[in-house]
């Protein structure tokens, strides 16, 4: 009898606590998870606007117009980030969504709105997904209009778009005459958008600041520049660590395209290691023609990713706007490569062609070896050759340097390279001293190790 009374009492308390509470209160929403069957039959457009804030970092609230409970978490005085994905041929959620939301909330009190249009983007027919992009933009405009009516400002709107999502972001920006704060395009989709006029794709006039990264220009991405600044990591194609043959399956098709997202996520925490060097072409960058960052003083060359807006004032005033910047990356997260230029002037009377390997050493014994351009260099008397050297470690202070010269030949005589001056210029950390070594001889295939010294005249 007492036990029955106890359980009945618990039931009554539970009913009283739940009485008056809506069905949706406290409910967490998740990104739409579909499959290849949905892709084959096609999906009608249905958009979820999943809100994450410091108050609900793990429990998304849907901001659909018929759902008022989600708006209690939306603080319009904060900056709002819209993250919009692209084409989803298999229907599965993007693997990066949880990570990018978490990283944004770790660095600042944002409203993060994940634009889930998986129902619409999931189809085997890419053009069907592309045809829905303007409808998604219309839905986003209705939400932004609602936010503006509650006190939000267009300055506080930041749109991050992936592939088709980049063009969706551009369409939203056009409806506000380019007044929204910022758009970042992560490898904007190329198919059906290449060669289109500005009103039919992302363009630098769509926001106060538009920055773009291109990682798959020979495949799924857009090749030409679109923003106030366009970054081309590894030249915009063939990203390190991505499969080179179709034998790798689906990764072969999507890895380069998707790398743009992972580079951007890394930039949220790196805060400065992925430095882009303005240049006309990737080749010019590789041969050392693009090291002058004086136009950005007192800043360095622009940093790729989230912190690129620090260079906004320098970039938007260009007439016409449009800066291409290049940098190289490692194959894995955090993707950082530390760049130097190795300048060599020789006084050998005969021209020599060969390869240079350089190793840097620190006081505690750490060693990092250069990843130099694969092309051989031609060393002519009194002509300086600049080689781009890339290292996967940042050694500071650097105590010793070793250099090896080789022609790559396994037969024939061994050559000497008489060096008048060798200069190592830091590009990633430009505040560090330029290091030199003067008047020495490199014997072919013999490693020469020495202590570097500050250059006597860095203007030489």
From Swiss-Prot:
It is a peripheral membrane protein. PANTHER family: LIPASE (PTHR11610), LIPASE MEMBER H (PTHR11610:SF12). This is Lipase member H-B. Keywords: Cell membrane, Disulfide bond, Glycoprotein, Hydrolase, Lipid degradation, Lipid metabolism, Membrane, Secreted, Signal. Glycans are attached at residues 67, 75, 177, 289, 366. It comes from Xenopus laevis (African clawed frog). It is found in: Secreted; Cell membrane. The keyword Secreted applies. Its EC number is 3.1.1.-. Pfam families: Lipase. Disulfide bonds join 242-255, 279-290, 293-301, 436-455. GO terms for cellular component: extracellular space; plasma membrane.
């Amino acid at each position: 009898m007492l036990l029955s009374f106890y359980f009945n009492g618990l039931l009554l308390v539970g009913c009283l606590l739940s009485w008056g509470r809506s069905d949706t209160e406290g409910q967490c929403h998740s990104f739409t998870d579909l499959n290849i069957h949905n892709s084959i039959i096609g999906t009608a457009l249905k958009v979820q606007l999943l809100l994450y804030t410091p108050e609900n970092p793990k429990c998304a609230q849907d901001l659909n117009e018929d759902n008022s409970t989600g708006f209690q978490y939306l603080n319009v005085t904060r900056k709002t980030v819209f993250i919009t994905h692209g084409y989803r041929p298999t229907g599965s959620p993007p693997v990066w969504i949880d990570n990018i939301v978490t990283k944004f909330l770790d660095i600042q009190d944002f409203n993060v709105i994940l634009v889930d249009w998986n129902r619409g983007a999931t189809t085997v027919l890419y053009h069907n997904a592309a045809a829905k992009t303007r409808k998604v933009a219309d839905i986003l405009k209705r939400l932004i209009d609602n936010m503006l009516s509650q006190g939000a400002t267009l300055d506080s709107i930041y749109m991050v778009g992936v592939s088709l999502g980049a063009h969706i972001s551009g369409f939203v920006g056009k409806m506000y005459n380019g007044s929204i704060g910022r758009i970042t395009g992560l490898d904007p989709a190329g198919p059906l958008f290449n060669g289109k006029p500005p009103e039919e794709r992302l363009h630098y006039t769509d926001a106060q600041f538009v920055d773009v990264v291109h990682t798959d220009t020979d495949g799924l991405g857009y090749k030409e520049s679109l923003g106030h600044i366009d970054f081309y990591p590894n030249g915009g194609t063939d990203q390190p660590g991505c499969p080179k043959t179709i034998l790798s399956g689906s990764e072969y098709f999507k890895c380069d395209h998707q790398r743009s997202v992972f580079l951007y996520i890394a930039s949220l925490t790196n805060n400065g290691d992925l430095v882009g060097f303005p240049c006309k072409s990737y080749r010019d960058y590789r041969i050392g023609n693009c090291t002058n960052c004086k136009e950005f003083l007192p800043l360095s060359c622009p940093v790729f990713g989230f912190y690129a807006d620090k260079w906004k004032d320098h970039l938007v005033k260009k007439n016409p706007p449009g800066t291409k910047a290049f940098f190289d990356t490692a194959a894995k997260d955090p993707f950082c490569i530390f760049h130097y230029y190795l300048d060599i002037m020789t006084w050998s009377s005969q021209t020599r062609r060969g390869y240079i390997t350089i190793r840097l050493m620190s006081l505690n014994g750490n060693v990092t070896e250069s990843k130099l351009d694969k092309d051989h260099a031609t060393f002519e008397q009194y002509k300086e050759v600049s080689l781009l050297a890339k290292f996967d470690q940042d050694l500071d202070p650097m105590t010793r340097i070793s250099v090896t010269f080789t022609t790559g030949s396994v037969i024939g005589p061994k050559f000497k390279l008489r060096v008048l001056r060798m200069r190592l210029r830091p590009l990633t950390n430009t505040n560090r001293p330029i290091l030199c070594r003067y008047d020495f001889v490199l014997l072919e295939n013999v490693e020469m190790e020495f202590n570097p010294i500050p250059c006597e005249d860095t203007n030489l």
